[in-house]
UniProtKB/Swiss-Prot annotation:
This is Methenyltetrahydromethanopterin cyclohydrolase. It comes from Methanocorpusculum labreanum (strain ATCC 43576 / DSM 4855 / Z). Belongs to the MCH family. Keywords: Cytoplasm, Hydrolase, Methanogenesis, One-carbon metabolism. One of its GO terms (molecular function) is methenyltetrahydromethanopterin cyclohydrolase activity. Catalyzes the reversible interconversion of 5-formyl-H(4)MPT to methenyl-H(4)MPT(+). The keyword Membrane does not apply.
Length: 314
């Protein structure tokens, strides 16, 4: 079985060795744990975003950047693909670990989740659990973790604190925008898992989404989510004829909340995240190739108007 932490650690070491080339900052804490700042006090960039996203996927995904169009506007897109959709997306990339300690708060994702089993049910349904002496975690936060935070992560992962490695980027940073858009495939796999579909039947997955502009901390969560909700396009290859029973529920347009920028929806919900229809967190359009029957299905559509409004271009 592949180890997402061992693969992620190899990429982490590459990033550390070339920190200056990627506009990131490397820190070794007093307890021996290691942190790479990808956007808190440094600019980061596309190179750092590439590493952050691939590490977040446990080294089981590839990404590329390209120029595309959102309506009449040229935008940079991120293309993502993986041959291990369930493990890379649900077992690693999913932001399934809320890391809290004193005044520190972060959404945790990446390989370390496969050691801490956060949340446990996810790993039960995909039948995966990592074994590694090192833990690599990706933190979506606006400050760097302290030694005490890294100690807590080590305890949850059952590893020595000196073997804990963290990458950190705020949502409202270039790397933050890149890595959230880089979750476009994960949202499709996540949605199918939430619907009760066996995601281990997905053979391969690929997708694309525009990288949203950095518009400040207040708008960051909404803008980054909208990139996938309204313009994420995904291709799934699977051996699962039963997918026909799930098709109409997959795309974001199946949600009651669909049709407005996320920040507008959030405001209408009284800024209570839990009042938002969970089914909204899905890609705009999905193409599925079911190989046992040879059938191809298409559901959903991109919404250029809402995307541009969210991005500040309309």
């Amino acid at each position: 079985m592949v180890s997402v932490n061992e693969l992620g650690l190899d990429l982490f070491e590459e990033l550390v060795e070339n920190a200056d080339l990627f506009n990131v900052a490397y820190h070794e804490l007093d307890n021996g744990s290691r942190v790479v700042d990808c956007g808190v006090s440094v600019p980061g960039g596309y190179g750092a975003g590439d590493y952050f996203t691939r590490i977040c996927m446990g080294g089981l995904g590839d990404i590329a950047f390209r120029q595309g169009m959102v309506g009449q506007f040229p935008m940079t897109f991120i293309d993502v693909n993986t041959d291990f959709p369930a493990i890379s997306c649900l077992g690693s990339q999913k932001a399934g670990w809320t890391v809290k300690h004193d005044n520190f708060f972060a959404m945790g994702s990446g390989p370390a989740r496969a050691l801490s089993l956060q949340p446990k049910h996810t790993f039960e349904v995909i039948g995966y659990e990592d074994e590694s002496d090192a833990a690599v975690i990706c933190l979506e936060a606006d400050r760097l973790p302290s030694g005490a935070v890294m100690e807590m992560i080590a305890e949850k992962c059952k590893v020595d604190v000196a073997n804990v490695c963290a990458l950190v980027a705020p949502t409202s940073s270039l790397v933050g925008s890149i890595q959230v858009a880089g979750r476009c495939v994960e949202t499709a796999v996540y949605k199918l898992n939430e619907l009760g579909f066996d995601t281990t039947k997905i053979i391969a997955a690929a997708g694309t989404a525009p990288i949203p502009p950095v518009r400040g901390a207040k708008l960051a969560m909404g803008v980054t989510n909208d990139a996938t909700i309204y313009h994420g396009q995904i291709n799934l290859t699977m051996n699962a004829p039963e997918i026909v029973d799930y098709l109409e529920k997959i795309p974001s347009c199946s949600s009651n909340g669909y049709g407005k920028p996320f920040n507008d929806i959030f405001k209408e919900a009284g800024y209570d995240f839990y009042k938002i229809d969970k089914s909204l967190f899905s890609p705009a359009e999905v193409i599925i190739n079911e190989v046992s029957t040879g059938k191809v299905y298409q559901v959903g559509k991109v919404d250029t108007a809402v995307t541009l409004k969210s991005f500040g271009l309309a």
